[in-house]
């Protein structure tokens, strides 16, 4: 049974690893990463609160005669 010749293996593995490293580096360099979000200025919104009294027909008493 013939012996497996392994003398050329290091000369094949070293360039292969170098090539894989370079390809990986090029892919990482060309990747567009998202920028961190900028802080957003928060504006205070006026929400309608049910406890704020607003005079509408809903609040008028039914027992009183209509006023014009």
UniProtKB/Swiss-Prot annotation:
Residue numbers bearing the N6-acetyllysine modification: 54, 57
Modified residues (N6-succinyllysine): 54
Coiled-coil segments on the chain, per record: none
Membrane topology summary: Single-pass membrane protein
GO CC annotations, alphabetized: mitochondrial membrane; proton-transporting ATP synthase complex
Keyword Ribonucleoprotein: no
One of the Pfam families matching this protein, by short name: ATP-synt_8
Compartment list: Mitochondrion membrane
Superkingdom of the source species: Eukaryota
Spans traversing the lipid bilayer: 8-24
A GO molecular-function descriptor: proton transmembrane transporter activity
Alphabetical UniProt keywords: Acetylation, ATP synthesis, CF(0), Hydrogen ion transport, Ion transport, Membrane, Mitochondrion, Transmembrane, Transmembrane helix, Transport
One record GO biological process: proton motive force-driven ATP synthesis
UniProt function note: Subunit 8, of the mitochondrial membrane ATP synthase complex (F(1)F(0) ATP synthase or Complex V) that produces ATP from ADP in the presence of a proton gradient across the membrane which is generated by electron transport complexes of the respiratory chain. ATP synthase complex consist of a soluble F(1) head domain - the catalytic core - and a membrane F(1) domain - the membrane proton channel. These two domains are linked by a central stalk rotating inside the F(1) region and a stationary peripheral stalk.
UniProt similarity note: Belongs to the ATPase protein 8 family.
Assembly and interaction partners: Component of the ATP synthase complex composed at least of ATP5F1A/subunit alpha, ATP5F1B/subunit beta, ATP5MC1/subunit c (homooctomer), MT-ATP6/subunit a, MT-ATP8/subunit 8, ATP5ME/subunit e, ATP5MF/subunit f, ATP5MG/subunit g, ATP5MK/subunit k, ATP5MJ/subunit j, ATP5F1C/subunit gamma, ATP5F1D/subunit delta, ATP5F1E/subunit epsilon, ATP5PF/subunit F6, ATP5PB/subunit b, ATP5PD/subunit d, ATP5PO/subunit OSCP.
Protein name: ATP synthase F(0) complex subunit 8
Organism: Gorilla gorilla gorilla
Gene expressing this chain: MT-ATP8
